[in-house]
Amino acid sequence: MLPTGIIRPPAELELLNHLAAAFITRQAVGDYAPGAPLAAAVEKVHVLDFPSLVPPAAVPNHAADSKNRCVFCGSLYPGLREPGFALELFRALGPASGWPLTMAGGGWQYFAADAAQTKAVLGEQFEQPGPVPAETARTMQAQADVLLNLGNAVANQLPSKLFDYFAAGKPVLHLCVIENDPALPYLARYPLALVLHQGQADAADILHRWLGEVCGKQLPFGEVCDLFPELVPQAVAAEFVRWLM
């Protein structure tokens, strides 16, 4: 399966010339359109969604304390995935909301001023553990009440993390910073999702109400698979067989 993002036409075309077929995500289709860098290989590629719906790891579901938790685990990048909208929302909620925000991962050196401002407002309710091992991240996400997804600022990259969130069955808060966010069609099919758009005047009020409504809710994995039947491993394997046999 070929990635989206940075396109290196000579190298990718050479690779495609040696393949019988290749699978691409929907976000990469434009790279093979007439006049696009990889148009010459359009007959070789087939669209396949993320094959990412697998049962979450068995870890404790709740932390020792009774705090509500909103958790993000991932790296931050200027111009691609920034924390500003999330920090603005949780500053607006304030410490009285009772919702700590935990954002684990690297990249905070680019957003130190915004983080410091948030820490001044939220105090201990804003946690930055830094980069954590994958096992720790899985535990943090399993113990979260709400999972935070930061929408990318480009339309040709869809965070695979989103499908891990769906598989966990937890409420998902998605913060959208572009109109053509590629995650939106998937989020529209997930009943425990809230999408907020940057610049939305009443975003903090909507978030406050939603947090109260979804806290403690969780979808069984089987129900999530029914929502996204094309994303389960069996469906993906069937597509491989259909195109390669």
Question: What is each of the regions a protein language model found here?
Answer:
Residues T25, F72-S75, A104, P129:
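Short hydrophobic "strand-cap" motifs at the C-terminus of beta-strands
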Residues I6-V45:
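A short, active-site helix/loop in glycosyltransferases that binds the activated sugar's phosphate group
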Residues A142-E230:
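Catalytic binding pocket for nucleotide-activated donors in carbohydrate/polymer assembly enzymes
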Residues L38-V42, V54-V71, L93-A96:
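Nucleotide-sugar donor-binding and catalytic loop/hinge architecture
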Residues F23, H62-R81, F90-R91:
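Conserved donor-binding/catalytic core segment of Leloir-type glycosyltransferases
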Residues T102-G107, A112-T136:
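Nucleotide-activated donor-binding/catalytic signature segment of Leloir-type glycosyltransferases, i.e.
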Residues A28, F50-P51:
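Carbohydrate-associated surface elements
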Residues M1-G5:
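Active-site proximal beta-strand in glycosyltransferases
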